[in-house]
Amino acid sequence: EYPEAPANFGLLDQHKALTWVYKNISNFGGDPEQITIGGQSAGGGSVINQLAYKKNKPMIKRAVVESGMFINPFMTMFPSRSLTDAEKIGQEFFEFCGVKNLKEARELSTEFLFKKWDEWGGFPKSAMTWGPVNDGSFICFNFFDAVEKGLIEVPPLLTGYTPDEFNFGPIGADKSEEINTIELALRKLTNALEKNGNKNKNFLYRFDVPIPGWDNPGKFHSVDLWFFFETLAKCWRPFKGFHYDVSRQMCNYLCNFIKTGDVNGLDSYN
C-alpha cells in the first residue's frame, strides 16, 4: 500500500515523535541539540533500531539502552526477518482471523484481534513473530555487523544488564553453565566500539544488587528500574537503607549522563 514504509510502523511512530520533539522542544524551554533517547527491554531494542536509522542521526545526542539488546547475535528467540517473511506471517494471521484482505482486517475490532492474538500463541509467540523487519527502508542492515565494521557512529551510550535475565543453558545446567545473552551482546558491542576507535564515551553497567524477598528472586529482568527511577518505596519488597543509597547514586548517574554525556558529570577528572 505504501512502499516507502512497508513495515516497522511502531518504529516509524517513534521516529515521528522524536522528530516532533526536535522541532518543537525549544518552545518549551528545551534544547533540540541535547536530546537523549532511552529505553528498557523492548524499548532498549527500539533505541538500537532508532540509532541505526540514518534520518535520526542529527537529532540524537545520547542514548540509554537498559537490558535491550534483543537485536543481537546471541538472542535467537528474536530473529531478524525479511519483508517477504514478515508478509507471509501476516497473511497466515489474516487467515487465522478469517479475513481475506487488508480492508476486511481493518474492520476487525480490537477485542477480536486481541482474542485471536491470544489464541495464535500470545506473547511467547508474538515476541518471536512481530518484531522489527529488515524492510530495506527503516531497517537496512544488521546493527551489530555495522558497528563491528565501523560503518555506523554510535553516540555516547549508557547501557547495561542484570545478571539473572535471559539466561540460557543446556537442560539441567547449573548456574555456572548459564549464559546471559544480553551480557554477551553488550560486551560484543562495547568491544567493537573500542576496536573501531569510536570517539564517544560509552558506559557499561552490571546491576548486581541483592534483592530481598521470600521468593529469593535474584536480579531479574526490569528490577533495576526501581533503582534508576527511585521508586523503591512503591514496592512491597523489604528494601533497606543501602538499597536507597544505591538507588540515589544510580539516578544521579542517569541524570548526569543525560545532561552531560558522562555518568560522573562535568566535574569528573577521569
Task: Give the location of each predicted region.
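Substrate-access "cap/lid" subdomains that shape
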Residues: 23, 52, 57, 62, ...
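Alpha/beta-hydrolase active-site loop
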Residues: 3-27, 82-94
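A structural signal for well-ordered alpha-helical segments within the folded catalytic domains
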Residues: 12-19, 45, 84-88, 183-187, ...
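Mobile gating loops/cap/lid regions near enzyme active sites that modulate substrate access
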Residues: 164, 187, 191-270
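Alpha/beta-hydrolase fold nucleophile elbow
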Residues: 21, 28-41
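Glycine-rich nucleophile elbow surrounding the catalytic serine of serine-hydrolase chemistry
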Residues: 39-49
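Core-facing hydrophobic residues within beta-strands of well-ordered domains
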Residues: 32, 59-60, 202
